[in-house]
């Protein structure tokens, strides 16, 4: 059976995955900054790395999965002030909303979900170590900065040289930075900032910079070196580059062995932004589409590829998922455990072990669905449900999915049942024109009728 290979951003190639400790995986993913509702870009990060940890566990690894919460940030401070609420009130509200969104999408809770504000002592200890190693300095404005020029490996993740990076930077003469690429480790307090965001330190009152938060939380919960670090492609530079500089600058050795980055989400082939009016929260999307459809839509694309969001693509995902559930509607699975040596399962495993190739893995699921349609095999139904369950799909009764997503579902079901009865009466009276009219009228409402042996008629969404 195949071995897992992961595309390592740092190496720029797929590599055989070998954990530091045999049989155990330590993984960290950059989570949300909680000042607003999560958008579909966040949904992709959640689902992609949920998939990764699910597959690692299914492969027999003992996984420790950490996904942080950034609950202190300039945007958070600004939004709380605008709303007239405390930082903690704002962040808790959006943490609760994030948890609801994640649960709807079938995203399992990480083993640890550290909040940055609970790890300030660890951040201060890391900054102190960097200062002792000659990599941090206090600037004239009171901030403590990281000295990029003094870390030899800077740029190795992004593949950019210091000269190339500096060419794109503007120097602010008032910052006191030694180099325009230097970044803040500790931000000195400003008079107008609330006391909630001020901590004491040997450098004066202040709060941590964004990059130091992840380094400190990751090292505290997973150790100074761990297996996998993930996040969106937008975090590769500067955030992850700066994490490497901080963590390796403090410890003197490798921080992370495998760096994983999921691709961008675009909307109708354009960059998602509020200014373009194409910015959608998870909640807005879930008002129109079933949560499992959204998860399926995300998994149909390879995690490293660009994902293009549109209503048409979500409709297509819904139709595809409907085909799989329809295959299971009339075939109950047997009660034996999933057979990972069966031919479809082997191909599924090979796809997932090839850098989490979900498009190929889902193609295997469709092969199973097609064979179930032909053979009505309980064994194949068990295999389809079992394999799909590994990636968080097809875990509802088929009829529940096929009847879901209808506005006023209870009233609609009553109406449909009544129309099916009226159609049956019309057919008995040999009024086939009326029977056809009822079928066509329901189809216009997105309902497909299927006549079964014995005079039974079932329905499903189109």
Swiss-Prot record:
Binds 1 zinc ion per subunit. GO terms for cellular component: cytosol. It catalyses: tRNA(Cys) + L-cysteine + ATP = L-cysteinyl-tRNA(Cys) + AMP + diphosphate. CDD domains: Anticodon_Ia_Cys, CysRS_core. Its EC number is 6.1.1.16. The keyword Transferase does not apply. Keywords: Aminoacyl-tRNA synthetase, ATP-binding, Cytoplasm, Ligase, Metal-binding, Nucleotide-binding, Protein biosynthesis, Zinc. A motif ('HIGH' region) lies at residues 32-42. Signal peptide: none annotated. One of its GO terms (molecular function) is ATP binding. PANTHER family: CYSTEINE--TRNA LIGASE, CYTOPLASMIC (PTHR10890:SF3), CYSTEINYL-TRNA SYNTHETASE (PTHR10890). Monomer. Belongs to the class-I aminoacyl-tRNA synthetase family. This is Cysteine--tRNA ligase. It comes from Herminiimonas arsenicoxydans. The lineage of its organism: Bacteria, Pseudomonadati, Pseudomonadota, Betaproteobacteria, Burkholderiales. The gene is cysS.
